[in-house]
UniProtKB/Swiss-Prot annotation:
UniProt biased composition (Basic residues): 1-13
Alphabetically ordered keywords of this record: Cytoplasm, Ribosome biogenesis
InterPro entries, per database record: KH_dom-like_a/b, RbfA, RbfA_dom_sf
Gene Ontology CC annotations of this record: cytosol
Single GO BP term: maturation of SSU-rRNA
SUPFAM superfamilies reported in the protein's UniProt record: Ribosome-binding factor A, RbfA (SSF89919)
HAMAP family hit by this protein: RbfA
The protein, known as: Ribosome-binding factor A
Pfam family, one: RBFA
Gene: rbfA
Subunit structure: Monomer. Binds 30S ribosomal subunits, but not 50S ribosomal subunits or 70S ribosomes.
Length: 140
C-alpha cells in the first residue's frame, strides 16, 4: 500500500486554488472600483492613472498581494509605495464592497510582467535570434 503524500507538499507543487483565484479577482475588481471613484486623498495618487493587474491571495485568505502598473510612463515602485501608505483606507473601502470573514491585509508590488514581456520581445527580434528563426535556403 502506498502512503499518501501530505497535502502541504502536494499543494506546493500546484498553483493557487480555485478559491484563491476567485477571492483575488473579487479583490482586484473591488479595488479598481474604489480607485476609480477618486476618493483617495494622497497627493501622489490624485490624478494618477494606474491599473491593478493581478491580486494573489494567500491560502488562508489573510494576505493579498496586489500588483499595480502605471498607465503610460511612470514609476511603478513609487506608485506601490503610495498605495501602501493608504492601504488602511483601501482595506476599509474594500470591506464595504466585498464580504469576507476576514478582510485580507493588502500589500502592493509593482507589476514587472510588462517589462519582462518587452524584454522577451526585444530578444526575439534581435538579429542573432532572427537568423536562427528564419528558414535557410539550403535546407529546402
Amino acid at each position: 500500500m502506498q502512503k499518501k503524500s501530505s497535502s502541504k507538499s502536494h499543494r506546493a507543487t500546484r498553483g493557487p486554488s480555485q478559491r484563491q483565484l476567485r477571492a483575488g479577482e473579487l479583490i482586484r475588481r473591488a479595488l479598481s472600483d474604489v480607485v476609480t471613484r477618486g476618493t483617495i486623498q494622497d497627493p501622489d495618487l490624485i490624478e494618477r492613472s494606474f491599473s491593478v493587474t493581478e491580486v494573489r491571495v494567500s491560502p488562508d485568505l489573510r494576505h493579498a498581494t496586489c500588483f499595480v502598473a502605471p498607465l503610460g510612463k511612470g514609476d511603478a515602485a513609487a506608485l506601490a509605495a503610495a498605495l501602501t501608505r493608504v492601504r488602511g483606507y483601501l482595506r476599509g473601502q474594500l470591506s464595504k464592497e466585498v464580504t469576507f470573514k476576514y478582510m485580507p491585509d493588502l500589500t502592493f508590488e509593482p507589476d514587472t510582467s510588462f517589462d519582462k514581456a518587452e524584454q522577451i520581445d526585444r530578444l526575439l527580434h534581435s538579429p542573432k535570434v532572427s537568423q536562427d528563426l528564419s528558414p535557410q535556403d539550403d535546407e529546402e
